[in-house]
Amino acid sequence: SKRRTAQMQAITATIQKEQNQVIRHADAPTLLVNGIAGSGKTSVLMQRIAYLFYQQRESLDPSEVFLITPNPVFERYIEGVLPDLGERNPECLTWDEFLRGLMPPERSGGQAPASLDAFERIDEACATFSFDQHDFKEIHCNGERLVTVGQILQVAAKFRNIPAGPHLVTLMREELLRRLDSRLKQLAASDKVLDEISMLTLDQQVELFRETFDPHDESQVREVAQQYVDLRFADARRAVENDDWLRIDRIGMRLLGVENLVPVEWLYLKMALTGLGNADAKYVMIDEVQDYTVAQLAVLARYFKRAHFLLLGDQNQAIAPGTATFDQVRALFREVRGPLEECRLMTSYRSTPEITQLFASLLDDDERLSISSIQRADTAPEIIACASEQDYDRELRRVLAQAVGDDGLTAVVVPQKHQAKLLRKKLGDAAPALIDAAATLPASGVVLVPLKLAKGLEFDHVIVPDASERAFPDDPLSRRRLYTTVSRATRGITLLAQGEITPLLAARA
């Protein structure tokens, strides 16, 4: 009908206006995008990156743009999207990949929380800190001790009038590299190294030097020997350049009075002491910003010291305890980056109006009244409260059997992985396949998915097998988990409970 067409045109114009507000936003130190479920945040992110590349096509290199995402699958996804938009890919990292690139393998694992208080104590302590002999460690490589603690202490004494911090560590690093070069020259002139070179087979020569050699005079012999030791002890040079001669753990324990540093504390301390960071990055995009802790965001803000930040997320999809609230995100980036600008995306093009209305009912009045959907009306959400366990079991099996015959893909979404295992045990042969992080979703059928994996995905239908108060009590975290669960559905949703439905939805039951 003409009226429907006019409505669609008006809604489409609203979406374009909302999204263009982000895509074409003037450059800002920090741009925070708070978008409801299904509002096209991923699309906006891709188009924003493409827009920046186009705007700065003469000066912006993909290596200067970083995308931090909690989802490792996202990297594969953007490999196809940005080239289609005519652009090369930015650097794409998960938090774990970011840590692994900067920390020793034995230190980079784990998600132990840290507070900004610890960072403030590190900053305060570094202002008056002095190294002692226990803060240093030797550099060994291929059986050779190349930098000793005694040498590091000599270098520290040379610069004793300079306070601890990036300037001092830079001076010490440069002096240690000079001493390492001197040590490698001595090794290159040693009989031991000359004997090792003379014993190399042709295959070993090619493996090391990518060519064979046959030196004819002493200068050529010295040149080959220097190349040999430089290659053989390249890891030692990297260790000095990376400040691996500092015992960050030991320094941190002394500064903070703790027995062990969590990974983000370790990394923050190394940044504070050495100036570790990326000064070349121009833009950093953090997707699903509500999934990060304040400490993680503080580390990213300090590491990418000169970059402008685009922060995308949905404050109502913070489904893990301890992550940053949007108020905390605003406060942090205003403190470290200055003015912060914000855009809202309030129109859903993923879910039907009925589903959109259901997850919007979980929000505050102001937010709920601003949300709309562009999809056609479809079936109303089905909310089933069963009086007995027998009734519940029968209804659950009926709903699952019906879903098997439906078109599209149905997800049975549970809050935690252990609940998925309990449900599979209860249903036996009728249980859907449990999806894990490595699995590829089928195009149709029924799958069982923990909420953590379902987040960021969409399904034609969603079944919530336990929407009781036990699973979703009336508290802010459960409210966000239910909002996230419901908003995975595009066309239909069924919620079941043995006993009363969660009070979060009681008015709709």
Regions found by a protein language model. Give the residues of each.
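Post-Walker A alpha-helix
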Residues: 45-46
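Conserved helicase motor core of SF1/SF2 NTP-dependent helicases
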Residues: 58, 63, 72-80, 84-97, ...
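Alpha-helical nucleic-acid-binding subdomain
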Residues: 53-285, 291-299, 307, 316, ...
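Pre-Walker A adenine-sensing motif
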Residues: 13-25
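Conserved lysine of the Walker
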Residues: 41-42
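Pre-Walker A (Motif I) flank of P-loop NTPase domains
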Residues: 27-31
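Hydrophobic anchor at the beta1->P-loop junction of P-loop NTPases
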Residues: 33-35
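Charged, amphipathic alpha-helical linker segments immediately N-terminal to NTP-binding catalytic cores
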Residues: 1-8
